[in-house]
Amino acid sequence: MSWNRKDAGWARLLLALLLALSAAGCATTQVVTRPSAAPRLAPAFAEAAALARNHAALAGQARVDNGIRIERLLAGIDDATLARDAAALPAGDPLYDFVGRALLNRGLPLPRPFDRGGNWRFDAGNRPPADSDGYRPPMQLGVLLPLSGSLSTAAGPVRDGLLAGYYAEQRRRPDIAFYDTADTAGGTLAAYDKAVAAGADYVLGPLGRDEVDTLFRSGRLTVPVLALNRGNMPPPPGSASFSLAPEDDGSAAAEYLIARKAPRVLVLADGDDGTRRAVAAFREQLQARGGTVVAEIGITSEPGDLAPALATAVQKDGGVDAVFLALKPAQARALAPQLVLAGLGGKLRVATSQLASASSELTKDHALDGIAFPSEAWAVRNVTGLPSAASAASQLPNARGGAAKLFAFGYDAWLLTAYLERLANDANGKVEGATGTLRIDGFGNVVRTPAWSTYSGATAVPLGNAGG
């Protein structure tokens, strides 16, 4: 084959072209990766996050006030945004415990388990491994109750409910012993010391709010505690609290109405201490979630003619979407016809759990039909390990009337001693108890979602899809 000068020129041109393409190819293979933008958080969420970063460094009332500010900021965020921003928080973020509690209170799932290495954690000690359903009770249980003193009447149903759950369980059970707190601070500390000295590896109680604070403040909890009330002191690491507080009724009622887009509420309330606490919690939660208390009308033991006051409330700009009845059953029954005459009979009506104790004489004429109220799940559905509420009431005085709520509370206290580890470590761990669905937040507080019921004549019936 011949090779001339013309061919050499083409070869040089081709080589130059290949070199240029090669250089260009090398230049374009370098890929610059830019970091993805951080998710944009709701302004209130970002403000709450800033407060949470400093929360652990605070103490006393400053810490309490900071926690309240965080909760109020989160309360004003809608469900979808709260869930989205919660999922964006990195592991270990101090805001997650607050956000998780807000999600649980709204009946929403957690994006991941609580970060148990921080504010609160559970230690099973030397308990045998858990069963497949999470059952892992302590080895020896000490129960602190006021078997004497002003709270002894309440302690009886709690004790009987606890023992009903204990003896219904056929698997391994702890040794159990009861210690009288005498409803005093000194008696509580002495009872705790006796339980620990006797070998208890878990302590249940005390029942009084002041006694819970005394124990949590003592700095002597060598054995963890599940307190049966909620005081002003948060549970120490490893301990927890479970309560049936009036504040829970108020907060649950507010969530119930907000979920049903009924933000403008007329409040009817009597003046006892429990009612005042429920109404205060209702107002705070409703306002934090964007609602308004249109008016609050005080009710005496025998309500008179409220027509003028009801008419004034109805005629306010924006009207009334719902009525919150923080009343005893007889008061609610007496007012029901007046609500109808004022044009409020067709509005959403929600009451506190007091309505669950209405007698058949108050409900038989259907005047209370349609009023929603939080109740023990046991009253409207079967609970494993317990006979029906009606059957138990026919056999046990401590499971009748108002005592039935405390009986169910005692039963759930037993469940919590056995399933607390599962609740602590599973993102959506829960126990279907006699008082409702039980979960635990990132601070060691048991969060209870009640069953919602209404009356159909003399019978309490469950409300489907009724949670907040």
Language model region names:
Residues 320, 336-411, 425:
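Extracellular/periplasmic periplasmic-binding protein-like sensory domains
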Residues 195-208, 225-228, 264-269, 317-332, ...:
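Periplasmic-binding protein-like
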Residues 239-298:
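An alpha-beta-alpha
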Residues 389-466:
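Segments of small-molecule ligand-sensing domains
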Residues 22-25:
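C-terminal motif of bacterial Sec signal peptides marking the signal peptidase cleavage site
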Residues 233-256, 365-377:
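Short beta-strand elements at the ligand-binding edges of bilobed clamshell
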Residues 153-158, 168, 172-233:
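Beta-alpha junction/loop-to-helix N-cap segments that form part of ligand/metal-binding clefts
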Residues 27-30:
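Bacterial signal peptide processing site
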